[in-house]
Amino acid sequence: MPTNARQAPLIALIAGEDSGDQLGADLVSALRKRYPDARFVGIGGARMQLKGFESWYDIRELSVMGFAEVVRHLPRLLKLRKALVARLLAERPDVVVGIDAPDFNLGVEQRLKQAGLRTVHYVSPSVWAWREKRAEKIGRSADRVLCLFPMEPPIYAKHGIDARFVGHPLADRFALVSDRVGARDVLNVPQNVPVLAVLPGSRPSELARLGTIFLDAAKRVAQAMPGLRIIIPAANPRVHEQLQTLVGSWGDVESAPLLLDGKAHEAMLAADVVLLASGTATLEAMLSKRPMVVGYRVSPTSYRIARALNMLKTDVYALPNILARACGLGNDLLVPELMQDDCTAANLASATLALMQDSERRGHVVAAFEFLHQQLRGQLEGEAADHAADAIAELLETPAATAAG
């Protein structure tokens, strides 16, 4: 039976991967400040469990990526979703919060909302980039959407959906003023040399498409800038092995890159410019206040299908450029982005070298990044998890019939 939401609510959270576990852990802490006697249940990882969360299933059950892998595990995932929905309907928590993982969570949320439970979706899918009509499905699934980016709530508002910007948690974890000197000391990189950080992707499949192109581009820049230091952080041991093979064929020992185990944040901070694959890493580079050149390729078939079905809603892809437009910094590209057929070693090298040699341009980019960092923190006091907890607490204090609309 539902608990008294004003005293000891039963709050269900469903996190599907490592990033969701971190968001969930921060959210549990923030909600517990408001509801010390609350009980937290659902699916979560080690970080959430350390906060007193009761996980009914192993979070790794949901950690599948890529179309082929999802298809292979689909029967198991459907069985898990059915069991989870049944248990949540039996327990009837005061609110159910799906954290990211939209392919799994939205179906769960929709079934529960239809049954009269309050539902929240934390982390909006990228409706600003492609398939905006997904907002309507999300609205059928969630009473409230908690957004990490300021351009997202207006999109939902067009569809009559309650969405709140709560700030981006990464914006809380990155300092507003970056420490290049400290980062170079940590990596034992001299303070007086130009440094290029190269991040060609964190997944083996990305490296297979981009690794050779990015390292060839870096080598071209090194040939044009004697004394350049190149640092490449490896996201995990498998990626390190792939990068080691690529670096092994570099040839010129003097300009050979420094390959790191992890330490992507330090590598970005130490750099003058970052050459990286499009994705979350571009947001991290922006919050590190590092000018960047962004490149990416998907398979030609995937790209043609997306174009043919008009699934892409934007003509820019790098998050800093999308945010710059959304926050009123104009339509010009803040950072160079080279996508698909334009993502060649020659083009990446040319854009990177131009940025390395233009200190005035780099200063302009850094100033814009400082502004965007503040925008992602939002105008309210406190951290993103606190804003998210406030939005959930407000829903908890609303009668269920009203919350369901």
Feature roles, as predicted:
Residues 1-405:
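Nucleotide-activated sugar donor-binding and catalytic core shared by glycosyltransferases
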